[in-house]
């Protein structure tokens, strides 16, 4: 190729490149006009590209009117599965952290009728869970809500300390018996629904149905009525089916993301198990339960969350904590129920079995669901000779109480141990106050342990039921 041909060829290439650049420029101008016009009508419609590198650094590239804004943020890692690696904190007394006064508010506000409330926490907060009756206190449908199992019941949650209303309550699942717990990543919930002789448990994980469990004894399949506990992605639940006043059939069931990975029939010396109050510690779960058949002493289930195995026995102390119950005994029983008049049927309760710092809760009345007290009984879980060392009144005996159970905020990073907490249900209405109202509902108080001694006080429901007449 001679010099003139080379010159013409180079000129042609330059002209072609110039035309291409001109076309690209026109395209960019058209795109900018289009984006600007679209942004005027939809100012939030910006283009965003997010890239996450291996160091968990997030690069956010936001294109606004052809301008790139780069934000560099450190991504918060997922909290991960809960590991029960701490022991219980020592407690010298109990302080109230929440009291919802639901019945007092219910005299003039639209408060939902509930029973069987409990408290359960997640990495962000603690909430109250309760089984509603499909009505509010002032609604005529509240008549007859003393019945435990109806088609209108379901589990709701509300911010702890707030009385449950239609506007602040979140529906969880349909049923008349429940338990719920968070594994650090998401929440698992179980509700039992249906007929007494043919009930079904529905299991939800991350608010999605994952498993169903059909009755195995055709006699009121039921579960804890307080929170379950998880360790390293496995959540354990105690469920019972069978007679309330005779030999029943209890299972300890292990779940992963809402699906069953193992079942165990009840082992050990406990004769009857219902409504367990469970808490986690040292890679174990301890459940303090209700013997509705024979024992005024409470049965205990100890669960190894590494081996997924359990055993059962009774709290050893002769200080009895069920209701109704006979007089306290000088010597307790570790492996057999303590009977006597008045004895059965019983009430849901709890305890924290922490060797020398063991605390047990019970109604003050041995016969009625009234009053509530916490008793410090060193080594009550293992020593039949153990005696009451300290007593703290929570609700005076001239006021109604009800179910009680344990809970723990496992995500409280301010402590090197798990601070024990509990709640007390304050039942109002029928059957004790049938003279004034036709409904049964409750308010709730929640308390947590203090590392130093505390003062005194009584925290009753406080509503004047005659105002509802």
Swiss-Prot record:
It is found in: Virion membrane; Host apical cell membrane. It is an enzyme of class 3 (hydrolase). The keyword Acetylation does not apply. The keyword ATP-binding does not apply. It catalyses: Hydrolysis of alpha-(2->3)-, alpha-(2->6)-, alpha-(2->8)- glycosidic linkages of terminal sialic acid residues in oligosaccharides, glycoproteins, glycolipids, colominic acid and synthetic substrates. N-glycosylated. Glycans are attached at residues 28, 32, 46, 55-56, 65-66, 85, 143, 198, 232, 356, 399. Pfam families: Neur. GO terms for molecular function: exo-alpha-sialidase activity; metal ion binding. Residues 1-6 are intravirion. Disulfide bonds join 89-417, 121-126, 181-228, 230-235, 276-289, 278-287, 316-334, 421-448. Ca(2+) binds at residues 291, 295, 322. The chain crosses the membrane at residues 7-27. Keywords: Calcium, Disulfide bond, Glycoprotein, Glycosidase, Host cell membrane, Host membrane, Hydrolase, Membrane, Metal-binding, Signal-anchor, Transmembrane, Transmembrane helix, Virion. InterPro entries: Glyco_hydro_34, Sialidase_sf. Its EC number is 3.2.1.18. GO terms for cellular component: host cell plasma membrane; membrane; virion membrane. Intact N-terminus is essential for virion morphogenesis. Possesses two apical sorting signals, one in the ectodomain, which is likely to be a glycan, and the other in the transmembrane domain. The transmembrane domain also plays a role in lipid raft association. This is Neuraminidase. It comes from Influenza A virus (strain A/Equine/Prague/1/1956 H7N7).
